[in-house]
Amino acid sequence: MQTPKETLSERLSCVQDKIIDHYENDSKDIDSQIQYWQLIRWENAIFFAAREHGIQTLNHQVVPAYNISKSKAHKAIELQMALQGLAQSAYKTEDWTLQDTCEELWNTEPTHCFKKGGQTVQVYFDGNKDNCMTYVAWDSVYYMTDAGTWDKTATCVSHRGLYYVKEGYNTFYIEFKSECEKYGNTGTWEVHFGNNVIDCNDSMCSTSDDTVSATQLVKQLQHTPSPYSSTVSVGTAKTYGQTSAATRPGHCGLAEKQHCGPVNPLLGAATPTGNNKRRKLCSGNTTPIIHLKGDRNSLKCLRYRLRKHSDHYRDISSTWHWTGAGNEKTGILTVTYHSETQRTKFLNTVAIPDSVQILVGYMTM
């Protein structure tokens, strides 16, 4: 009859042989990575059992302390379960390597997300190139939603920090103000991504889409739509007294906002012809717009593709959505125009996917 040490030694040899097979095979399917973390879990369970029996070595290996084996086993369970959930998503057919699913990358910011395609972001503090810190923006970030499903997005880089959009909300995992407090003295910093310097009003999103440059600039609208009408007219805030921040890289100019009164729903929809009564509700120019409504990921790709048609519109927003139950999965892009003629030309020239709904209206700028 075998002793506990002999039994555990045999089991450990079997498990570790299979772990070595995973290293040698370097498989790229997600099921192999799930099996790998299950083996790591078993390996540490064997070490834990050995400690319980007072065994100090197995197969000439020193048996780790209780807390070490327990901690490693818990981490293996965490990664195994995360990968099992990811395997139920649309991303299971992508390549998944040991490097993509390693513990070090899982614990790297943003934590508890799978990440691929890292790109360097350099931040210079105090205007001093010798006082520089390097951060990572990811082409792909795979995160678990509140509903327990998995979604995919990309890291965006702004003057404020590094973030990804999780269920319609910007989730920052690095904030440069906090970093500046640690590494700077003057409270100023410059953000360099690719060949660009990002100022207060710009952001850049990393992407793995072959049709899109990984360092394309995403210009944000400075006016946020106000939810008075979901189909035609949207009131916006009017800003004034804004201080230039171009020469102060660490401080964005702050502006007071004067809000227009809500649009009276009895006025009806504004049309390209006739009198627009909304002009009387607040000061500013009424600008022709369209809302493009559809799947958020599809809109993100569409927004980038529309850049080659920039002569056919004035501005384009980032993807946004109305708050409330059931609205998080549907995104909206707002496109503004210099004139109704330009808008008409845009609609007649630019191909919009059938899955995207087009809503025509006006915005007071």
UniProtKB/Swiss-Prot annotation:
Coiled coil: none annotated. Phosphorylated. Sumoylation plays a regulatory role in E2 transcriptional activity. It comes from the Viruses. Residues 1-205 are annotated as: Transactivation domain. The keyword Secreted does not apply. GO terms for molecular function: DNA binding; DNA-binding transcription factor activity; nucleotide binding. Disulfide bonds: none annotated. GO terms for cellular component: host cell mitochondrial membrane; host cell nucleus; host cytoskeleton. Signal peptide: none annotated. Belongs to the papillomaviridae E2 protein family. It holds the Pfam family PPV_E2_N. SUPFAM superfamilies: E2 regulatory, transactivation domain, Viral DNA-binding domain. Plays a role in the initiation of viral DNA replication. A dimer of E2 interacts with a dimer of E1 in order to improve specificity of E1 DNA binding activity. Once the complex recognizes and binds DNA at specific sites, the E2 dimer is removed from DNA. E2 also regulates viral transcription through binding to the E2RE response element (5'-ACCNNNNNNGGT-3') present in multiple copies in the regulatory regions of the viral genome. Activates or represses transcription depending on E2RE's position with regards to proximal promoter elements including the TATA-box. InterPro entries: E2/EBNA1_C_sf, Nucleotide-bd_a/b_plait_sf, Papillomavirus_E2_C, PPV_E2_N, Reg_prot_E2, Regulatory_protein_E2_N, Regulatory_protein_E2_N_1, Regulatory_protein_E2_N_2. It is found in: Host nucleus. The lineage of its organism: Viruses, Monodnaviria, Shotokuvirae, Cossaviricota, Papovaviricetes. GO terms for biological process: DNA replication; DNA-templated transcription; regulation of DNA replication; viral DNA genome replication. Residues 286-365 are annotated as: DNA-binding domain. There is a cross-link at residue 293 (Glycyl lysine isopeptide (Lys-Gly) (interchain with G-Cter in SUMO)). This is Regulatory protein E2. Keywords: Activator, DNA replication, DNA-binding, Early protein, Host nucleus, Isopeptide bond, Phosphoprotein, Repressor, Transcription, Transcription regulation, Ubl conjugation. The keyword Phosphoprotein applies.
